[in-house]
From Swiss-Prot:
Name assigned to this protein: RNA-binding protein YbxF
The family this protein is said to belong to: Belongs to the eukaryotic ribosomal protein eL8 family.
Compartments reported by the entry: Cytoplasm
UniProt entry keywords in alphabetical sequence: Cytoplasm, Ribonucleoprotein, Ribosomal protein, RNA-binding
One GO CC annotation: cytoplasm
Name of encoding gene: rulS
Pfam family, one: Ribosomal_L7Ae
UniProt entry tagged with the keyword RNA-binding: yes
Disruption phenotype: None; has no effect on viability, growth or sporulation at low, normal or elevated temperatures.
GO MF annotation terms: RNA binding
Subunit structure: Found associated with the 50S subunit of the ribosome during exponential growth but not during stationary phase.
Function recorded in the entry: RNA-binding protein that recognizes the K-turn motif present in ribosomal RNA, but also in box C/D and box C'/D' sRNAs.
Length: 82
């Protein structure tokens, strides 16, 4: 499951804005996006990742994604870094 990938990853970037920046730098291996996040926020992340041929995984909950990242709040998007 993608929550496990995030919690076991050595290096991650949390949040949509930071994920977009990392995608533009070309340092992203995979993107994980929460289905319950606002599509207005996550659509740019998903489209940019797909344009670059980067795998996009969808998870059910922002809260669980945030917990997998080790933070107390939800996370809409997370980038797993190369």
């Amino acid at each position: 499951m993608s929550y496990d990938k995030v919690s076991q990853a050595k290096s991650i970037i949390i949040g949509t804005k930071q994920t977009v920046k990392a995608l533009k730098r070309g340092s992203v291996k995979e993107v994980v996006v929460a289905k319950d996040a606002d599509p207005i926020l996550t659509s740019s992340v998903v489209s940019l990742a797909e344009d670059q041929g980067i795998s996009v995984s969808m998870v059910e909950s922002m809260k669980k994604l945030g917990k997998a990242c080790g933070i107390e709040v939800g996370a809409a998007a997370v980038a797993i870094i190369l």
